[in-house]
Protein backbone atom coordinates (compact mmCIF):
# COMPACT_ATOMS: atom_id res chain seq x y z
CA UNK A 1 0.00 0.00 0.00
CA UNK A 2 1.46 3.33 -1.02
CA UNK A 3 0.98 6.21 1.40
CA UNK A 4 1.76 9.88 1.18
CA UNK A 5 4.23 11.34 3.66
CA UNK A 6 1.48 13.02 5.69
CA UNK A 7 -0.34 9.77 6.30
CA UNK A 8 2.90 7.93 7.04
CA UNK A 9 3.86 10.52 9.66
CA UNK A 10 0.38 10.40 11.20
CA UNK A 11 0.58 6.62 11.52
CA UNK A 12 4.05 6.84 13.01
CA UNK A 13 2.74 9.25 15.63
CA UNK A 14 0.84 6.34 17.13
CA UNK A 15 3.69 3.90 16.61
CA UNK A 16 5.96 6.26 18.48
CA UNK A 17 3.95 5.53 21.60
CA UNK A 18 5.59 2.11 21.51
CA UNK A 19 8.92 3.72 22.24
CA UNK A 20 7.47 5.63 25.16
CA UNK A 21 5.91 2.52 26.67
CA UNK A 22 9.04 0.45 26.16
CA UNK A 23 11.14 3.20 27.71
CA UNK A 24 8.94 3.15 30.80
CA UNK A 25 9.24 -0.62 31.04
CA UNK A 26 13.02 -0.59 30.86
CA UNK A 27 13.81 2.69 32.57
CA UNK A 28 16.97 2.82 34.66
CA UNK A 29 18.72 5.70 36.36
CA UNK A 30 21.93 6.49 34.55
CA UNK A 31 24.34 9.09 35.81
CA UNK A 32 27.37 10.44 34.03
CA UNK A 33 29.08 7.07 34.37
CA UNK A 34 28.00 3.64 35.60
CA UNK A 35 29.55 0.18 35.59
CA UNK A 36 27.57 -3.05 35.23
CA UNK A 37 29.64 -6.16 35.83
CA UNK A 38 28.88 -9.66 34.58
CA UNK A 39 31.65 -12.24 34.88
CA UNK A 40 34.69 -10.75 33.15
CA UNK A 41 32.64 -8.15 31.26
CA UNK A 42 32.48 -4.68 32.76
CA UNK A 43 30.00 -2.47 30.92
CA UNK A 44 30.71 1.20 31.45
CA UNK A 45 28.09 3.80 30.57
CA UNK A 46 28.63 7.46 29.94
CA UNK A 47 26.51 10.41 28.85
CA UNK A 48 28.28 12.13 25.96
CA UNK A 49 27.70 15.73 24.87
CA UNK A 50 28.70 17.15 21.50
CA UNK A 51 27.58 20.06 19.38
CA UNK A 52 26.89 21.13 15.80
CA UNK A 53 25.25 24.20 14.28
CA UNK A 54 24.91 25.77 17.70
CA UNK A 55 22.95 22.80 19.10
CA UNK A 56 24.08 20.56 21.95
CA UNK A 57 23.42 16.84 21.57
CA UNK A 58 23.34 14.38 24.47
CA UNK A 59 24.27 10.87 23.42
CA UNK A 60 24.74 7.70 25.47
CA UNK A 61 27.90 5.60 25.33
CA UNK A 62 28.30 1.97 26.44
CA UNK A 63 31.43 -0.17 26.20
CA UNK A 64 33.26 -3.03 27.90
CA UNK A 65 35.92 -1.34 30.01
CA UNK A 66 37.57 -4.69 30.79
CA UNK A 67 38.85 -4.74 27.21
CA UNK A 68 41.79 -2.78 25.87
CA UNK A 69 42.62 -1.55 22.41
CA UNK A 70 40.51 -0.24 19.56
CA UNK A 71 37.33 -2.02 18.57
CA UNK A 72 34.45 -1.77 16.08
CA UNK A 73 31.90 0.89 16.94
CA UNK A 74 28.16 1.15 16.34
CA UNK A 75 26.03 4.30 16.27
CA UNK A 76 22.38 3.66 17.15
CA UNK A 77 19.62 6.01 16.00
CA UNK A 78 16.44 6.13 18.03
CA UNK A 79 12.81 6.03 16.99
CA UNK A 80 11.26 9.41 16.33
CA UNK A 81 10.16 9.69 19.96
CA UNK A 82 13.73 10.59 20.91
CA UNK A 83 16.59 8.94 22.76
CA UNK A 84 14.74 6.77 25.27
CA UNK A 85 15.91 3.84 27.38
CA UNK A 86 14.84 1.45 24.61
CA UNK A 87 17.67 2.74 22.42
CA UNK A 88 20.09 2.83 25.34
CA UNK A 89 19.35 -0.81 26.06
CA UNK A 90 20.28 -1.68 22.48
CA UNK A 91 23.59 0.08 23.12
CA UNK A 92 24.10 -2.03 26.23
CA UNK A 93 23.40 -5.20 24.26
CA UNK A 94 26.04 -4.30 21.70
CA UNK A 95 28.55 -3.35 24.38
CA UNK A 96 28.18 -6.80 25.95
CA UNK A 97 29.11 -8.25 22.57
CA UNK A 98 32.36 -6.31 22.52
CA UNK A 99 31.41 -3.27 20.48
CA UNK A 100 31.65 0.36 21.43
CA UNK A 101 28.04 1.55 21.15
CA UNK A 102 26.74 5.10 21.12
CA UNK A 103 23.04 5.89 21.12
CA UNK A 104 22.71 9.11 19.14
CA UNK A 105 20.65 12.17 20.05
CA UNK A 106 19.25 13.35 16.72
CA UNK A 107 17.03 16.15 18.02
CA UNK A 108 19.45 17.92 20.34
CA UNK A 109 19.45 18.72 24.05
CA UNK A 110 18.28 15.18 24.81
CA UNK A 111 14.78 16.15 23.70
CA UNK A 112 12.11 13.49 24.04
CA UNK A 113 8.67 14.22 22.65
CA UNK A 114 5.91 14.59 25.22
CA UNK A 115 3.21 13.48 22.77
CA UNK A 116 2.80 12.24 19.19
CA UNK A 117 2.24 15.75 17.83
CA UNK A 118 5.58 16.90 19.23
CA UNK A 119 7.24 13.74 17.89
CA UNK A 120 5.90 14.49 14.44
CA UNK A 121 7.12 18.09 14.67
CA UNK A 122 10.60 16.88 15.65
CA UNK A 123 10.88 14.26 12.91
CA UNK A 124 9.29 16.11 10.01
CA UNK A 125 12.33 18.30 9.19
CA UNK A 126 14.36 15.14 8.51
CA UNK A 127 11.76 13.73 6.14
CA UNK A 128 11.55 17.05 4.33
CA UNK A 129 15.34 17.46 4.14
CA UNK A 130 17.19 14.11 4.35
CA UNK A 131 20.51 15.99 4.25
CA UNK A 132 19.81 16.79 7.90
CA UNK A 133 20.12 13.06 8.63
CA UNK A 134 23.73 13.08 7.46
CA UNK A 135 24.58 16.38 9.15
CA UNK A 136 23.39 15.21 12.56
CA UNK A 137 24.85 11.73 12.22
CA UNK A 138 28.19 13.19 11.13
CA UNK A 139 28.30 15.18 14.38
CA UNK A 140 27.93 11.96 16.37
CA UNK A 141 30.48 10.26 14.16
CA UNK A 142 33.03 12.97 14.85
CA UNK A 143 32.43 12.67 18.58
CA UNK A 144 32.79 8.90 18.78
CA UNK A 145 36.09 9.08 16.91
CA UNK A 146 37.53 11.13 19.78
CA UNK A 147 37.60 8.08 22.05
CA UNK A 148 40.83 6.09 22.06
CA UNK A 149 39.02 2.74 22.01
CA UNK A 150 37.12 3.55 18.80
CA UNK A 151 38.49 2.03 15.61
CA UNK A 152 37.83 4.87 13.14
CA UNK A 153 37.97 2.44 10.22
CA UNK A 154 35.29 0.15 11.66
CA UNK A 155 32.18 2.20 12.37
CA UNK A 156 28.62 1.28 11.42
CA UNK A 157 25.17 2.68 12.24
CA UNK A 158 21.81 1.06 12.93
CA UNK A 159 18.38 2.62 13.27
CA UNK A 160 14.82 1.74 14.23
CA UNK A 161 11.76 3.04 12.33
CA UNK A 162 12.59 6.76 11.96
CA UNK A 163 16.17 5.82 12.81
CA UNK A 164 16.21 3.41 9.88
CA UNK A 165 15.26 6.29 7.60
CA UNK A 166 18.08 8.35 9.12
CA UNK A 167 20.88 5.82 8.67
CA UNK A 168 19.80 4.84 5.15
CA UNK A 169 19.67 8.42 3.95
CA UNK A 170 22.90 9.38 5.69
CA UNK A 171 24.57 6.47 3.89
CA UNK A 172 23.07 7.41 0.53
CA UNK A 173 24.39 10.93 1.02
CA UNK A 174 27.94 9.73 1.65
CA UNK A 175 28.33 9.20 5.40
CA UNK A 176 31.73 7.66 6.19
CA UNK A 177 30.44 4.34 7.53
CA UNK A 178 31.36 0.71 6.84
CA UNK A 179 27.72 -0.27 6.93
CA UNK A 180 24.20 0.61 8.05
CA UNK A 181 21.28 -1.50 9.26
CA UNK A 182 17.63 -0.46 9.11
CA UNK A 183 15.08 -2.25 11.31
CA UNK A 184 11.51 -1.77 10.02
CA UNK A 185 12.56 1.65 8.76
CA UNK A 186 10.99 3.98 6.22
CA UNK A 187 12.68 3.31 2.87
CA UNK A 188 11.91 6.67 1.27
CA UNK A 189 14.21 9.68 0.90
CA UNK A 190 16.92 10.60 -1.56
CA UNK A 191 17.89 8.40 -4.48
CA UNK A 192 21.28 6.71 -3.99
CA UNK A 193 24.32 8.05 -5.81
CA UNK A 194 27.05 5.58 -6.71
CA UNK A 195 29.67 8.29 -6.23
CA UNK A 196 28.50 9.00 -2.68
CA UNK A 197 27.40 5.67 -1.22
CA UNK A 198 30.26 4.07 0.72
CA UNK A 199 28.44 1.87 3.20
CA UNK A 200 27.17 -1.65 2.76
CA UNK A 201 23.48 -1.89 3.64
CA UNK A 202 21.28 -4.36 5.49
CA UNK A 203 17.52 -3.80 5.54
CA UNK A 204 15.48 -5.84 8.03
CA UNK A 205 11.87 -5.62 6.87
CA UNK A 206 8.68 -7.22 8.13
CA UNK A 207 6.85 -9.24 5.50
CA UNK A 208 3.51 -8.07 6.91
CA UNK A 209 4.50 -4.42 7.31
CA UNK A 210 1.52 -2.42 6.06
CA UNK A 211 3.23 0.95 6.55
CA UNK A 212 6.16 0.30 4.23
CA UNK A 213 4.35 -1.40 1.40
CA UNK A 214 5.44 -3.33 -1.70
CA UNK A 215 5.62 -0.24 -3.92
CA UNK A 216 8.02 1.47 -1.52
CA UNK A 217 10.09 -1.71 -1.21
CA UNK A 218 10.22 -2.20 -4.98
CA UNK A 219 11.29 1.39 -5.55
CA UNK A 220 14.05 1.10 -2.96
CA UNK A 221 15.37 -2.13 -4.48
CA UNK A 222 15.24 -0.72 -8.00
CA UNK A 223 17.23 2.34 -6.93
CA UNK A 224 19.83 0.21 -5.17
CA UNK A 225 20.13 -2.19 -8.09
CA UNK A 226 20.44 0.67 -10.58
CA UNK A 227 23.76 1.77 -9.05
CA UNK A 228 25.04 -1.67 -8.14
CA UNK A 229 24.82 -0.98 -4.41
CA UNK A 230 26.10 -3.61 -1.98
CA UNK A 231 22.92 -4.26 -0.03
CA UNK A 232 21.01 -7.14 1.53
CA UNK A 233 17.25 -7.05 1.95
CA UNK A 234 15.92 -9.45 4.58
CA UNK A 235 12.20 -10.12 4.92
CA UNK A 236 10.77 -11.77 8.04
CA UNK A 237 7.49 -13.57 7.25
CA UNK A 238 4.43 -12.49 9.24
CA UNK A 239 6.38 -9.70 10.97
CA UNK A 240 4.54 -6.40 11.08
CA UNK A 241 5.87 -2.90 11.47
CA UNK A 242 7.71 -2.37 14.80
CA UNK A 243 8.42 -6.11 15.09
CA UNK A 244 11.52 -5.61 17.27
CA UNK A 245 9.67 -3.69 19.97
CA UNK A 246 8.27 -5.74 22.89
CA UNK A 247 5.54 -3.15 23.52
CA UNK A 248 4.13 -3.28 19.99
CA UNK A 249 1.46 -5.94 20.51
CA UNK A 250 -0.25 -4.23 23.43
CA UNK A 251 -0.28 -0.85 21.72
CA UNK A 252 -1.39 -2.35 18.44
CA UNK A 253 -4.50 -3.68 20.17
CA UNK A 254 -5.05 -0.45 22.06
CA UNK A 255 -4.97 1.72 18.95
CA UNK A 256 -6.38 -0.87 16.50
CA UNK A 257 -3.21 -0.84 14.42
CA UNK A 258 -1.55 -3.74 12.55
CA UNK A 259 1.63 -3.79 14.63
CA UNK A 260 2.96 -6.50 16.92
CA UNK A 261 6.13 -7.70 18.55
CA UNK A 262 7.55 -10.76 16.83
CA UNK A 263 10.11 -12.50 19.03
CA UNK A 264 11.35 -14.75 16.24
CA UNK A 265 11.81 -11.87 13.80
CA UNK A 266 13.47 -9.79 16.51
CA UNK A 267 15.94 -12.59 17.23
CA UNK A 268 16.56 -13.42 13.58
CA UNK A 269 17.07 -9.81 12.53
CA UNK A 270 19.51 -9.28 15.40
CA UNK A 271 21.45 -12.37 14.31
CA UNK A 272 21.40 -11.14 10.71
CA UNK A 273 22.82 -7.85 11.93
CA UNK A 274 25.60 -9.67 13.77
CA UNK A 275 26.47 -11.67 10.64
CA UNK A 276 26.48 -8.41 8.69
CA UNK A 277 28.92 -6.86 11.16
CA UNK A 278 31.24 -9.85 10.86
CA UNK A 279 31.20 -9.38 7.11
CA UNK A 280 31.91 -5.65 7.04
CA UNK A 281 34.42 -5.57 9.90
Model-derived features: positions:
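Short beta-strand/loop motif that positions the catalytic acidic residue
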Residues: 203-205, 209
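Short alpha-helix in the alpha/beta-hydrolase fold that links the catalytic acid
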Residues: 90, 213-223
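Primarily recognizes the serine-hydrolase "nucleophile elbow" in alpha/beta-hydrolase
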Residues: 137-198
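C-terminal catalytic histidine-bearing segment of alpha/beta-hydrolase fold enzymes
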Residues: 227-281
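Bacterial signal peptide processing site
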Residues: 23-25
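Bacterial N-terminal signal peptides that target proteins for export
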Residues: 1-10
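Serine-hydrolase catalytic machinery in alpha/beta-hydrolase-like enzymes
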Residues: 28-42, 47-149, 246-260
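C-terminal motif of bacterial Sec signal peptides marking the signal peptidase cleavage site
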Residues: 18-21
